[in-house]
């Protein structure tokens, strides 16, 4: 996990290692097989909603997510203009006139409903939809649940990946986030929750703006990791139906990341992942686990150690799936990302689903966080 933080802080632009393709003579059956593969390939869309969500998809466009269509959605025209995506949607043109939602989830919700037809058209044909946003503001908090409902009703496996605000951002954003999270759980198959406060336990001296970038990077790694286990050729890939089996009606999920380059790197990485501050739940009753293993030279014995360790720590009836991606840039490091589904989270409370009222009715101390 610390290596991930270091990579964000000291990121250097390098061209990815390219392995030359071996030229193989094509036959008529190869062409037919290619067509069949294209027809059965899972269509995965990633939708970034609001300022934080658009920051995340912008980063995804930089690093590349194999086999995914990237869509940016916002009420703020100026912010949307700066984002890189395969498709951009300015929602609520009549309601907000492109000026944003003003940290009001109700405006974000109404903006998405106003643009429902355009959103529906953009999601047409998707087998799986990731919705990513930072909860606590207006657009992401309000619009993401509407988009999740649309995607799920259209038959797509709908997975929301969201961050919760830092405590220092104030009670208003915390209450808004709670409201948005409840609605996302209602309308998504699975909601992966990343509490930003937990980043402070990983790297307490991290500058605030860098902390937001690290949060973005964790969102990116979660979506990219799951997607490419399906779409990108690797040492061990997952079938889309495997992922559906774990994440369909998966409820609340948490993520843990661990890494090690020691002699016992596999076991240490698995232990770090399950003891990650981000994995802030009791996983013993979890209904499912998705394990993403990556490294330059992962051995089968090491993969077995990781899988057995995770399996021992979740419910015996939990469905555990796993895959391995070869990443030369990790060198001697093994990285383990686990997504644990069907957990009971303290971030979901049985209170009434309403965002915090206006500042005049419920005063709170707010800290303005600049856009990154």
From Swiss-Prot:
GO terms of molecular function: GTP binding; GTPase activity
Subunit structure: Homodimer. Polymerizes to form a dynamic ring structure in a strictly GTP-dependent manner. Interacts directly with several other division proteins.
Pfam family, one: Tubulin
One GO CC term on file: cell division site
Task performed by this protein: Essential cell division protein that forms a contractile ring structure (Z ring) at the future cell division site. The regulation of the ring assembly controls the timing and the location of cell division. One of the functions of the FtsZ ring is to recruit other cell division proteins to the septum to produce a new cell wall between the dividing cells. Binds GTP and shows GTPase activity.
InterPro entries: Cell_div_FtsZ, Cell_div_FtsZ_CS, FtsZ/CetZ, FtsZ_C, Tub_FtsZ_C, Tubulin/FtsZ-like_C, Tubulin/FtsZ_2-layer-sand-dom, Tubulin/FtsZ_GTPase_sf
Protein name: Cell division protein FtsZ 1
Organism classification: Archaea, Methanobacteriati, Methanobacteriota, Thermococci, Thermococcales
Subcellular compartments: Cytoplasm
Positions bound to GTP: 51-55, 138-140, 169, 173, 216
Chief localisation class: cytoplasm
Organism, scientific name: Pyrococcus furiosus (strain ATCC 43587 / DSM 3638 / JCM 8422 / Vc1)
Keyword Cell cycle annotated: yes
Highest taxon of source: Archaea
């Amino acid at each position: 996990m610390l290596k991930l933080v270091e990579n964000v802080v000291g990121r250097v632009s390098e061209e990815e290692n390219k392995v030359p393709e071996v030229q193989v003579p094509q036959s008529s059956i190869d062409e037919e097989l290619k067509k069949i593969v294209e027809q059965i390939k899972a269509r995965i869309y990633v939708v970034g909603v609001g300022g934080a969500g658009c920051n995340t998809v912008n980063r995804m466009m930089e690093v590349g997510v194999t086999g995914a269509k990237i869509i940016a959605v916002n009420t703020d025209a100026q912010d949307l203009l700066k984002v890189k995506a395969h498709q951009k949607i300015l929602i609520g043109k009549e309601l907000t006139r492109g000026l944003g939602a003003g940290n009001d989830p109700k405006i974000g919700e109404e903006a998405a409903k106003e643009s429902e037809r355009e959103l529906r058209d953009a999601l047409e044909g998707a087998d799986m939809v990731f919705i990513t946003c930072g909860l606590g503001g207006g657009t992401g908090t309000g619009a993401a649940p509407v988009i999740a409902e649309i995607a799920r009703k259209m038959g797509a496996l709908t997975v929301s990946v969201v961050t919760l605000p830092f405590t220092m951002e104030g009670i208003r954003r915390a209450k808004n986030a709670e409201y948005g999270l409840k609605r996302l759980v209602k309308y998504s198959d699975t909601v992966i929750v990343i509490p930003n406060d937990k980043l402070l336990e990983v790297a307490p001296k991290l500058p605030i703006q860098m902390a937001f970038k690290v949060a973005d990077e964790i969102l990116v790694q979660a979506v990219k990791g799951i997607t490419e286990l399906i779409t990108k050729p690797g040492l061990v890939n997952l079938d889309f139906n495997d992922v559906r089996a774990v994440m369909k009606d998966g409820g609340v999920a948490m993520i843990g990341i661990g890494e090690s380059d020691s002699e016992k790197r596999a076991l240490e990485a698995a232990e770090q992942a399950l003891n990650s501050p981000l994995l802030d739940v009791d996983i013993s009753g979890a209904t499912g686990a998705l394990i993403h293993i990556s490294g330059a030279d992962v051995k089968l014995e090491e993969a077995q150690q990781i899988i057995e360790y995770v399996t021992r720590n979740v419910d015996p009836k939990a469905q555990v799936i796993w895959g391995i991606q070869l990443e030369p840039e990790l060198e001697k490091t093994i990285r383990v990302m686990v997504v644990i589904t069907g957990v009971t989270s303290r971030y979901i409370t049985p209170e009434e689903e309403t965002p915090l009222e206006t500042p005049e009715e419920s005063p709170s101390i707010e800290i303005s966080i600049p856009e990154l």
